């Protein structure tokens, strides 16, 4: 069996070497010619996998080590009998850590207490749902908009218009869909963006085209009271440089790039492939996951909950380095910037997740215990 994998997918050898011959190449360069003789294709979101790519090839399994599937032509897979798998939830914790880091950075710049703001989460699937749990666990006021879930579950949801009208912070976590009952392409269009509350913060760590980038650029030029955090961009790896300059935090689609999430994605695809072929997995992620570099953190019982929150979040992620690296990359011509975007992602340093932290509190303080519990860190007793 022959396997072609995006070169940026980790642990491919460890999980798939016993199943066939592995070849790697950059995801954006995968084309029909590269698939000659290939049975299994392993990709990320940068590779569009559709009829044009696959027709006439021997590929019978496609695995994407990502949550989203908007780059896969699932209808064609079904028509052609091609098995496929994604990695739902693999990087959810990493994205939550990213959002928390950005919230802390914004609060510091604006001199505002996060506990006093009202949060709106648009899209409450694997990522957004986890974020809602964390924010509510911290005791913060959260509104949730998720029309597909609202049709299946009773209560607890609000409309998008209510989120825009009522929330000071809006974080987007929807898939990208162009049609259907709940299309999300330009979900935040010019009209909806114009309705943002004074001083609102908008965070997009979902898909670039969920927000009309040109409309957001125009709005930020007119509304200096607003703050924008963008990790995803329309037309990636091409980026609107003027829009990036106007964002408080701008990063190159790395919100979910925790080491844990990347390895989890490969493990999930391996498990899905084995299930589809009736094989017993011979490798477990726990055998390959490295231990955290930070062994643990200890707090006195007198510590302030807000300071503890900031310390724990920044122990795993602070967006300011990624923001600075990204801004330095926005030089040169379009081709140079596109190459720099991909290079930042390819060479991204190892980042761990909050739930890998071990925390000790010297004494009894229920407020501190609540912070640890909300974040999902491990409390040592």
From Swiss-Prot:
Keyword Oxidoreductase tagged: yes
UniProt catalytic activity: 4-phospho-D-erythronate + NAD(+) = (R)-3-hydroxy-2-oxo-4-phosphooxybutanoate + NADH + H(+)
Key words, A-Z: Cytoplasm, NAD, Oxidoreductase, Pyridoxine biosynthesis
Annotated positions binding substrate: 45, 66, 257
Pfam families xref list: 2-Hacid_dh, 2-Hacid_dh_C, DUF3410
GO biological process, one term: pyridoxine biosynthetic process
Keyword Calcium assigned: no
Coiled coil: none
Binding-site list for NAD(+): 146, 174, 205-207, 231, 256
EC number: 1.1.1.290
Disulfide bond sites: none
Listed SUPFAM superfamilies: Formate/glycerate dehydrogenase catalytic domain-like, NAD(P)-binding Rossmann-fold domains
GO CC, alphabetical: cytosol
Example of a GO MF term: 4-phosphoerythronate dehydrogenase activity
Pathway(s) annotated for this protein in UniProt: Cofactor biosynthesis; pyridoxine 5'-phosphate biosynthesis; pyridoxine 5'-phosphate from D-erythrose 4-phosphate: step 2/5
Location(s), subcellular: Cytoplasm
Active site per database record: 207, 236, 253 (proton donor)
Family: Belongs to the D-isomer specific 2-hydroxyacid dehydrogenase family. PdxB subfamily.
Main function: Catalyzes the oxidation of erythronate-4-phosphate to 3-hydroxy-2-oxo-4-phosphonooxybutanoate.
Quaternary structure (record): Homodimer.
This protein's name: Erythronate-4-phosphate dehydrogenase
